[in-house]
Amino acid sequence: MRIEDVRKEIDKVDSEIIRQIAKRQDLAGKIARLKFAQGLPVHDEKRTRAVLDDIFNRAVEAKIDPVSVQKIFEILVAMSEERQRECQGDGNLP
């Protein structure tokens, strides 16, 4: 196998990651509508902590750097909350 072949595989994985992030953002919009209808705030510290703890543990199980993976998910959670604010008319997204 050549390095170019492996890079093409990485590019495919990267494209799938982007698609999954977009799907996650769409789901965040659905969550926003449900939270708004129920009078719930965008930020839910208990849920955020549970997500990040779970991600940390899954990264350990997968034998990848859990701290780095947790940082990535901190960004994803922040993106989700911003999307939720945007759906409720309070966000800063373009």
Question: What positions do the PLM features span?
Answer:
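Domain-level signature for soluble enzymes in the chorismate/prephenate branch of the shikimate pathway
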Residues: 1-94
